[in-house]
Amino acid sequence: MTDDASKAWSWSGVAMTAAGELAAFAQMACAFPLRRLGAHTLSDVDDHPVPVVLVHGILGDPTNFFVLRRHLARHGIRRFSSFAYRPRLDYQRISRDLESHIAHVLTSTDAGQVDVIGHSLGGLVGRYFVQTTGKHFVRRLVTLGTPYLALHNPAQELAVFGSDDALVPPPYDRAPRRMRVIEGCGHLGLLTDGRALDTIVRYLRPPMWAANRAADVAA
């Protein structure tokens, strides 16, 4: 490939990522007026009985997960609770508020555990909760574009990154034990990209054969 062709290919990739980010931003902007609708959906009728707690990023809000929620609902995951917080960087303090929120969700649903999905700083909040007081209350943790600051992440965490995320690049030099990188995806795109959403579904809902094997082992 010539230098000119290589540069053209590189700029093409940048343009596609930028378009994806703009599309993600547009979808979130359109969902913003709906922020008071469906923030908490804890129906007892669900193929996936584990409640899913959604934690947005520092400048986000619960509507950021609008596309993700619709995608999960199509795959039988319909019990959601959105955790919102005021913008600040003290994720340890936010984690204490998340602990209270999850305790309320568990009490309201009679569930023993929750799944947590956090975007950006929201992933840090969820991870800190699991690593401190919430290990036994969180079945699975999904972090999207979350800074990786430790040598080890929780055993139940799936860390998802965008290859073209300028804010939180994938930590290839110290990769988490369970990491997925979505090619050509940026920071906001992790909330809307179909490949990222499918990755989350597969992690929260293992294949039927895996569930049957787990049941056989438990028996």
Predicted regions and their residues:
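Lipid deacylating catalytic domains
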Residues: 2-117, 121-219
